[in-house]
Amino acid sequence: MYSYFLGLRTLTVTRDAKELIEKNYDIEIDFDNMSFDDPEVYEMFAEGNTLGIFQFESTGMRAILKEMKPDNFENIVAANALYRPGPMSQIPTYIQNKSNPNNIAYLHPKLEKILNVTYGCMVYQEQVMQIVRDIGGFSMGRSDLVRRAMSKKKMKVMEEERRYFIHGKKDKSGNLEIRGAVRNGVDEKTANQIYDLMIDFAKYAFNKSHSAAYAALAYRSAWLKKYYPVEFMAAQISSMMGSSDSVSKYIRECRRLNIEVLPPDINYSEGKFIVKEGKIRYGMAAVKNVGSAAIEEIVKIRKEKGKFESFIDFCEKVPTTVLNKRQIESLIKAGAFDSTGAKRAQLMAIYEKTIDGISKQRKNNVDGQVSLFDSNSISEKFIPRDNLPKLKEFNEKVKLNLEKEMLGIYLSGHPLSEFEEVIEEMSNTNSSELMELSHEHSVEMDRRLYDGAKINLGGIIIKKQNKVTRNNNLMAFATLEDLYGSVELIIFPNTLDKYGEIIQEDSIV
């Protein structure tokens, strides 16, 4: 079910990216007639440049792709099928055989035409069906029975079929129903070995048609990322607006690709992330507490009445029925009013008074159309038009913390930016990779992060809570944030006693 959900999200991403591309470049993309033979797309796979690519973006998978160096569609179909618990054990053989096809040894020559596409490795259920047909003489229907037995792990049924596979079967009238491997020129010992391989394969049997469908989605995504990276990444981030860790990960990928991500802006942003002049504009619907419905109304009003010239102009044009104080505060903290020329510190000082004044004025006007700042308006008692208080802007740390509060990420900078090189040099992993280890396959494949391995991770302590143990010792729970996301830490008494002075909130460790 998880893969199907991911597949649906990927379809949304490709659809949204396609719409952005067609709008920005006035071209039409025809996925239905797309060929799967672009060497530059496969070069992306071979380089492990697949962050954001369906089924191919985990750390472990990207490491495998760099070793496998896929150069055709069959390779990525196989990679998708092999990268899961069970068949992973065949990945080294697949990679070695792909590099040295002359060294592939088949148990019997009849297997070559069936397994050559996967370099001698048994990868798909369909290959098993073909083996029992070509070597055992099974019918199409009976080979499907074997496939179903495998997919449901019915080992008893599979063992019953073994003797038919080797020696064949006669019907009640004595007519030969299944020829069997021996009659087809395969000796009994070899036939048993082949069947043993199929039994072992049953532990992780995967349907090639499923893997091919996933690979096709992945290829489309990779094609978009290769030729239209800005639109692809904008659509990708929009699809993950509910996950700050994912948004942070993809924005970091944008920086790696030299794609500039601009902050949310009341005059330029829409609900989703959009592309303008080769840059991504942050979606206002991703600002906490605001909501998509309110953003839709803001965009609608902006189209009808023009750009918002100032904070006051915004408050006059957008009714409080659309946006309340909390929502406006969130937009201020996120920097969405920066383009009006007002400082965030100034707006934080006046926004409540401004909204109260406008609300009172609207109540005093029957039709609600008289401007708050008409010459006879009583609202001048509340705040003069655009006369902002003389306040210094928040310092960089405060601004970044406000961004983090409202966006879930640091956008215009990061408290760790000046330490990035040192952290990268001294760390052997990051929070994003550690989060992926919650999946079994990542644990198996990442050779650096095996169970019990020593982890070096740099970041900033953003939260710490002390706790007294049953033995009256002090331990702590903490949250460490790095440039990729955050992880939860447990600090046991001995460690806390030794390093307690530096394990404090806001400490860089």
Whereabouts are the PLM-identified features?
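Noncatalytic, beta-rich nucleic-acid-contacting surfaces in large DNA/RNA-processing enzymes
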Residues: 1-509
